[in-house]
A protein has these predicted regions:
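An anion/phosphate-binding loop that grips the pyrophosphate of nucleotide cofactors and donors
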Residues: 184
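Glycine/threonine-rich flexible loop motifs
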Residues: 194-204, 229-230
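Gly/lys/ser-thr-rich phosphate-binding loops in alpha/beta enzymes
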Residues: 1-55
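Active-site glycine-rich loop that binds ribose-phosphate moieties when present
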Residues: 163-178, 203
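A short helix->loop->beta-strand "cap" motif at the edges of active sites that frequently abuts
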Residues: 26-27, 213-218
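Electropositive, gly/pro-rich neighborhoods at or near active sites that engage anionic ligands
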Residues: 34-159, 165
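Short, glycine-/small-residue-rich phosphate/pyrophosphate-handling segment
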Residues: 40-43, 229-236
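Charged helix-capping and loop-helix junction motifs
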Residues: 201-208, 234-236
């Protein structure tokens, strides 16, 4: 019996945990990662280079690194974060490497594939879209209605979510991601911050249509526990 083809949608630590589990089951893995991060090292590089935020993509690559000394060593190097009193403070080395490749070649998918080959990753890592996105949400609480913009801000939003949208709204997925979804035996959504890492995948029109028409099965992985600062985690 051949190994199943699995596409995993999400972002951040939740997606990384899912990938670490799935890689034991199948080598035919495609991770499709949110590209709306606006905080920390990713946010700084995104603003300076007008590039995709690399952090969640870096974490997915590290989670799928080759299971040998070479792969594990490079995964640790990719996750290495500088501590200094200068401009490098807080930057992860993997973020800088991905941004350098994108800046040089202008091709996010090629850059991810190059780093994937370096790390001997199991499967493939793709961005949810080829341009950096912003997440905007409308929450209602006892103080009234509030519009919040930004991935880290939406993740910590309080109250009942009334609307969630991407900016720009016409974001286009990668052809490679759409093909992987169409051919998948299984698609996973979650775990993670639902409002900022998982549900945005359903706001990309072409990707949502591909998921609606998929022949494989869809698995939704809820969070084991809620995080007090993450409103979207209350779904668990």
């Amino acid at each position: 019996m051949s190994s199943p083809r699995v596409v995993s949608l999400g972002g951040g630590h939740g997606l990384a945990a899912m990938l670490q589990a799935l890689r034991v089951v199948t080598p035919h893995l495609t991770a499709i990662v949110t590209v709306a991060d606006n905080g920390g090292s990713s946010g700084r590089l995104r603003e300076e280079f007008h590039s995709l935020p690399p952090g969640d993509l870096r974490m997915a690559l590290a989670a799928l690194c080759g299971d040998d000394d070479w792969g594990r060593s490079w995964a640790e190097i990719m996750q290495y974060r500088f501590t200094s009193s200068g401009e490098l403070n807080g930057h992860a080395l993997g973020n800088l490497l991905l941004t350098a490749l994108w800046d040089r070649d202008g091709d996010p998918v090629q850059g991810l594939d190059r780093v994937g080959a370096l790390l001997k990753v199991v499967g493939r890592v793709l961005p949810m879209a080829l341009q950096p996105l912003d997440i905007e949400a409308t929450f209602r609480n006892w103080e009234g209605v509030h519009v919040i913009r930004g991935q880290k801000e939406v993740a910590a939003g309080k109250g009942r979510l009334e609307d969630l949208r991407l900016i720009p709204e016409d974001a286009r997925p990668t052809p490679e991601g759409l093909s992987a979804i169409a051919e998948a035996d299984w698609i996973t959504l979650g775990p993670g911050s639902w409002f900022s890492s998982v549900l945005p995948h359903l706001l990309v029109a072409e990707q949502r249509e591909a998921l609606y028409n998929v022949k494989g099965k869809i698995l939704i992985a809820l969070n084991l526990d809620a995080v007090a600062t993450k409103s979207g985690d209350e779904l668990a």
